[in-house]
């Protein structure tokens, strides 16, 4: 917007341009009456983003002014659209009185809505965290800070590499990201909405410490354990300053800052989070994910907490066993069924408290807070049955808070209006002075009814009515047919098509009295509303602790229900290396299958640290690998797992190299993506890591791919000693267990009958004897003629015939001849592979079901 000088503009446009100059990089919603208007480039941009009309408002300084507008009562919907697109908006309100203003009404920016700092319900995803973050980079080191303004959770970390920084961005998924003007690794910021460039000085360490100490009311940061995290503090300082600037108010609910230490967590890189489909599937949706299966929480704040747990599995066995003990108690006594309906009535207290802290809570927020507090006595009654220590701690924090509940019951009407603007929020009887002025204003109805009746009878005018509108105030209306009966002291105020409107001294006096009393009542109510905030805010910390306790109680109760309903078992956690799972199942796949899921065991230990997995495509290799990782992840979240039994050793990281696609935006081929992920694993995996490697080397020539797969497997097995599941189509790799200790071959079974194949999905010891690739191609719908040609070519290759030798017509004709010897049936082939002595009762029953299905 090129504006040389404001002198040539109208006073109103001068005011607009001054406010716009204070907020140059974001959209300015400028309040004019019942509309928010945008001008110049803001109007053009908003018309594109919101698909609203672009018009012109006269001219200023001799040029037409582009303009776009939207009604104030619908602003939340438009803000939601802008926030979703990563835009920020300055909300400019009229704060002066138009009746007394000389020149333009006084206006000022009262808040700035940004993607990471929104607290309004309409603008927030209900069951997902909404984080704002800041990133700092210096000499290869990173500082990273995140803030959830709706809860006050403020964290810093110091990722040591670009890979770990990328993993943190993937885990936290901030909707707004602040970075300095001299930030170098800008590729980390690609494909993100809500990036905000900030001045370099905002990231200075001394400035950051000053900002943080001011926020927490402390002299130093030693008590928070972050004083040595200088890079993290640089990011945190910029972040807290930005949030203060946008909110235009104090932030009393942000009282501490926490160091997010990688040593306490099982680290998941970006590829692993994507491949395991924890909260988002590979297509970007939310169905068929781990969280969809596990998240039956009763409250939105519980749902958000569960997702945080899933994305940050922990290594602290004391905490994990504490969670498992709590789930076990809730499951064994069935108490989760009693808690669930009570928790549903409590709602999203966490975000209500954030709006309370920012003094932006609306009347219905406080009504919902009151309703939540009214549920606590019944919840306390249910929690009396608790015995487990952690459950008792949570119950003690969720006890009734009678003083606040009683205050809100006295103060707020049962069903208040949406906003305080027009009053009618505070309950009758809450304040004597307010009641008196309300009674005076409400007495108008009786007065008007009485006046109307008296005037009708006195002047014999049966069409006479007393009414009111915002423009003309109170009036007496008489139809045109009877207007000749209007007495002389009736002063005509307005002529309509079919009626005349008049005013009389008594009505005018009453109008002044009523409007004065309404205005006085509204002023008193708004003052009392602000005082109500003052009474509630000293209890904010207690209320937040209550909300946190209820969130965790909701998650634990939910996980108990899931464990009971889905037949999960309690994992045994160990500090030893390895894992032993009997009857393991994929938590997501088993829920979407119509047939019974084939459970499989896995055993990894010091003598068996790598499994070379072979078998057909579609045989279940990837499912088997993913279910192992998901069971390990769930155990480190502290929840029950889909298995008959599970002993899980200590993990520091989970890596997955499963599937790949071209990264066209970065100019990386499928093979380049695969090798980048493989390099990350080979550099960062340890003996405490769980590594999933699926089909390494597919994207290049056979010998290159085989060589890379062999070398990678050998390195993992001999140098790193990581617990590894290594799926491959290179049968040469099945020789590795003969060459190195700690390796074993397993395969997923399949039965071929004629041109058909049945996948048994059962993991067997030893290597597969063939790949069944042509059978899978046939299942996929490859034309039969192509399959026949492929079979003939395969036979040539297996018999050592020259690769360029053509098939003869005689050979092709032979394909159509019938065999005189009947082929064994599919069931017979499957039965021949079953060894009854190797089967447990459950496996025998599953085998019987599979054989039955083949008939």
Curated annotation (Swiss-Prot):
CDD domains xref list: ABC_MutS1
Do you know which Pfam families this protein is assigned to? MutS_I (PF01624), MutS_II (PF05188), MutS_III (PF05192), MutS_IV (PF05190), MutS_V (PF00488)
Q: Which UniProt keywords apply?
A: ATP-binding, DNA damage, DNA repair, DNA-binding, Nucleotide-binding
Q: Which GO terms describe its molecular function?
A: ATP binding; ATP-dependent DNA damage sensor activity; damaged DNA binding; mismatched DNA binding
For this entry, list what GO says about its biological process. Answer: mismatch repair
UniProt-annotated binding residues for ATP:
615-622
Q: Does the keyword DNA damage apply?
A: yes
> What is the superkingdom listed in this entry's lineage?
Bacteria
Task: Cite the Gene3D superfamilies for this sequence.
Answer: 1.10.1420.10, 6.10.140.430, DNA repair protein MutS, domain I, MutS, connector domain, P-loop containing nucleotide triphosphate hydrolases
* GO cellular component terms, A-Z: cytosol
Q: What does this protein do?
A: This protein is involved in the repair of mismatches in DNA. It is possible that it carries out the mismatch recognition step. This protein has a weak ATPase activity.
Q: Which HAMAP family match?
A: MutS
Q: Which PANTHER family match?
A: DNA MISMATCH REPAIR PROTEIN MSH1, MITOCHONDRIAL (PTHR11361:SF34), DNA MISMATCH REPAIR PROTEIN MUTS FAMILY MEMBER (PTHR11361)
Similarity-based family? Belongs to the DNA mismatch repair MutS family.
Name of the protein this chain belongs to? DNA mismatch repair protein MutS
Biological source species: Aliivibrio salmonicida (strain LFI1238) (Vibrio salmonicida (strain LFI1238))
The uppermost taxa in this organism's lineage are:
Bacteria, Pseudomonadati, Pseudomonadota, Gammaproteobacteria, Vibrionales
Gene designation per UniProt = mutS
């Amino acid at each position: 917007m090129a504006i040389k000088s404001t002198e040539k503009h109208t006073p109103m446009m001068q005011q607009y341009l001054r406010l716009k100059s204070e907020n140059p990089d974001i959209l300015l919603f400028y309040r004019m009456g019942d509309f928010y208007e945008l001008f110049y480039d803001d109007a053009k941009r908003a018309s594109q983003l919101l698909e609203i009309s672009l018009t012109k408002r006269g001219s200023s300084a001799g040029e037409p002014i582009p303009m776009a507008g939207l009604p104030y009562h619908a602003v939340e919907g438009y803000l939601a659209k802008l926030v979703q697109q990563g835009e920020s908006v300055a909300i400019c309100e009229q704060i002066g009185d138009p009746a007394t203003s000389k020149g333009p009404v006084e206006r000022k920016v009262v808040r700035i809505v940004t993607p990471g700092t929104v607290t309004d319900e309409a603008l927030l995803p209900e069951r997902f965290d909404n984080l704002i973050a800041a990133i700092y980079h210096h000499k290869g080191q990173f500082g990273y800070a995140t803030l959830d303004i709706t809860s006050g959770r403020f964290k810093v970390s110091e990722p040591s590499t670009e890979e770990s920084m990328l993993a943190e961005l993937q885990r936290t998924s901030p909707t707004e990201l602040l970075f300095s003007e001299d930030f170098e690794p800008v590729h980390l910021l690609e494909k993100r909405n809500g990036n905000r460039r900030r001045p370099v000085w905002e990231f200075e360490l001394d400035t950051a410490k000053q900002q943080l100490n001011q926020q927490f009311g402390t002299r130093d940061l030693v008590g928070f354990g972050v004083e040595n995290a200088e890079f993290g503090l640089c990011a945190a300082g910029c972040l807290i300053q930005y949030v203060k600037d946008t909110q235009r108010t104090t932030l009393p609910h942000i009282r501490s800052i926490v160091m997010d230490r990688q040593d306490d967590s099982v680290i998941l890189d970006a590829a692993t989070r994507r491949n395991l489909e924890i909260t988002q599937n590979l297509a970007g949706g939310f169905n068929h994910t781990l969280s969809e299966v596990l998240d039956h929480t009763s409250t939105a704040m519980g749902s958000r907490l569960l997702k945080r747990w899933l994305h940050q599995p922990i290594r602290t066995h004391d905490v994990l066993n504490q969670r498992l003990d709590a789930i076990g108690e809730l499951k064994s006594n069935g108490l989760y069924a009693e808690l669930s309906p009570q928790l549903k009535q409590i709602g999203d207290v966490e975000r209500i408290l954030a709006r309370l802290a920012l003094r932006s809570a609306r009347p219905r927020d406080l009504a919902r807070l009151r309703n939540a507090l009214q549920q606590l006595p019944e919840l306390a009654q249910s929690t009396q049955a608790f015995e487990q220590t952690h459950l008792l701690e949570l119950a003690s924090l969720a006890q009734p808070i009678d003083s606040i509940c009683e205050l809100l019951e006295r103060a707020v009407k049962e069903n208040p209006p949406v906003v305080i603007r027009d009053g009618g929020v505070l309950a009758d009887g809450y304040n004597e002075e307010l009641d008196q002025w309300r009674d005076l204003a409400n007495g108008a109805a009786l007065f008007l009814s009485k006046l109307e009746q008296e005037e009708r009878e006195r002047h014999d005018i049966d069409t006479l009515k007393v009414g009111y509108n915002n423009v003309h105030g109170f009036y007496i209306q008489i139809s045109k047919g009877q207007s000749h009966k209007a007495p002389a002291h009736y002063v005509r105020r307005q002529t309509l098509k079919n009626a005349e409107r008049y005013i009389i001294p008594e009505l005018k006096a009453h109008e002044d009295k009523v409007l004065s009393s309404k205005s006085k009542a509204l002023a008193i109510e708004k003052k009392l509303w602000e005082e109500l905030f003052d009474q509630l805010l000293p209890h904010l910390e207690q209320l937040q602790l209550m909300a946190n306790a209820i969130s965790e109680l909701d998650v634990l109760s939910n996980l108990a229900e899931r464990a009971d309903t889905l037949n999960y078992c309690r994992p045994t956690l160990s500090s030893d290396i390895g894992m032993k799972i009997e009857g393991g199942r994929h938590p997501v796949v088993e829920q979407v299958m119509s047939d019974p899921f084939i459970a499989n065991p896995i055993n990894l230990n010091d003598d068996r640290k790598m499994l070379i997995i072979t078998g057909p495509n579609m045989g279940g290799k990837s499912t088997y690998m993913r279910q192992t990782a998901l069971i390990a992840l769930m155990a480190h979240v502290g929840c029950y797992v889909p298995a008959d039994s599970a002993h899980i050793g200590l993990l520091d990281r989970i890596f997955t190299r499963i599937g790949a696609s071209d990264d066209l935006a970065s100019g990386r081929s499928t093979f380049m993506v695969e090798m980048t992920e493989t390099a990350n694993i080979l550099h960062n995996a340890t003996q405490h890591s769980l590594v999933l490697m699926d089909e390494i080397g597919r994207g290049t020539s056979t010998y290159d791919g085989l060589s890379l797969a062999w070398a990678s497997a050998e390195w993992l097995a001999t140098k790193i000693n990581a617990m590894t599941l290594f799926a491959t189509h290179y049968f040469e790799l099945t020789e590795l267990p003969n060459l190195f200790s700690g390796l074993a071959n397993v395969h997923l079974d399949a039965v071929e009958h004629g041109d058909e194949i049945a996948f048994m999905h059962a993991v067997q010891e030893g290597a597969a004897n063939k790949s069944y690739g042509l059978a899978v191609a046939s299942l996929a719908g490859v034309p039969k003629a192509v399959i026949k040609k492929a079979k003939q070519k395969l036979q040539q290759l297996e018999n050592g015939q020259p690769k360029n030798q053509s098939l003869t017509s005689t050979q092709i004709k032979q394909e159509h001849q019938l065999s005189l010897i009947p082929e064994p049936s599919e069931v017979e082939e499957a039965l021949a592979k079953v060894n009854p002595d190797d089967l447990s009762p459950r496996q025998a029953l599953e085998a019987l079901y599979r054989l039955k299905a083949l008939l």
